[in-house]
UniProtKB/Swiss-Prot annotation:
Gene coding for it: mtnC
The protein's name in its UniProt record: Enolase-phosphatase E1
Organism for this UniProt entry: Pseudomonas syringae pv. tomato (strain ATCC BAA-871 / DC3000)
Any one GO molecular function term: 2,3-diketo-5-methylthiopentyl-1-phosphate enolase activity
EC number: 3.1.3.77
The record's free-text note on cofactor binding: Binds 1 Mg(2+) ion per subunit.
One GO BP annotation of this record: L-methionine salvage from methylthioadenosine
Length: 227
């Protein structure tokens, strides 16, 4: 069955892991306190602050205490939904102000544009929120790439190392799993996608081996028609 759609990871695949850890996370950590103070009364922000109080079992926490909790979660690298939502809001403000530009490897830009022109449907699956995904591609160093993609998926579709998540995504795209090529730099994610019936290709940008999967070190070496 020929490939009709391509599902790609972001961190370590289309984009440098260092962009997330060395640029995005520090930017959010630096700007989150003032952002929360300035926007605490806005409904979408207030809802996330209330979620922090609930998850931390501190229902009476004031804004400064909530900020302290958020900074603790950042230090612990906790994947808390309200933290991710607030980080996304801070990043959006940064992208819109031109303070941030999404990193996408040039080889990934070229390949994604080429595949789109060839008629492949392109999708994203990342542990980062859908909003964060859209910002990386929509405000990238290479310009607005958002028009290349037909859909975005995050962990609301399930954990990235569980096969059921990939079946859920296949169902949402309208393609059979066997018609989808999944790209990632993490072997456990590739294993899960393969177990769901997808075809896989690993990105080993720094060399190395992704056991059990075809793997390359550049998007330019991926020919979807060869799978």
């Amino acid at each position: 069955m020929p490939i009709k759609a391509i599902l790609t990871d972001i961190e370590g695949t289309t984009s440098a892991v260092s962009f997330v850890f060395d640029v995005l996370f520090p930017f959010a950590r630096a700007h989150l306190p003032d952002f929360v103070r300035q926007h605490a009364e806005q409904p979408q922000v207030a809802a996330q602050l209330q979620a922090v109080r609930t998850q931390s079992a501190e229902p009476d926490a004031d804004v400064e205490r909530v900020i302290a909790i958020l900074l603790e979660w950042i230090a612990e690298d906790r994947k808390a939904t309200p933290l991710k939502a607030l980080q996304g809001m801070v990043w959006e403000q940064g992208y819109n102000a031109g303070q941030l530009k999404g990193h996408v490897y040039p080889d990934a830009v070229d390949a994604l544009q080429h595949w789109h022109q060839q008629g492949y449907r392109l999708f994203v699956y990342s542990s980062g929120s859908i909003q964060a995904q859209q910002l990386i591609f929509g405000c990238s160093e290479a310009g607005d790439l958002s028009g290349l993609f037909s859909g975005y998926f995050d962990t609301t579709s399930g954990p990235k190392r569980e096969a059921q998540s990939y079946q859920t995504i296949a169902n949402a795209t309208g393609f059979a799993a066997e018609e989808i090529l999944f790209l990632s730099d993490i072997v456990e994610e590739l294993d899960a996608a393969k177990a769901a019936g997808m075809l896989t290709c690993g990105l080993a940008r720094d060399g190395g081996v992704l056991a059990g999967h075809r793997h390359v070190n550049s998007f330019t070496l991926i020919d979807p028609a060869s799978f």
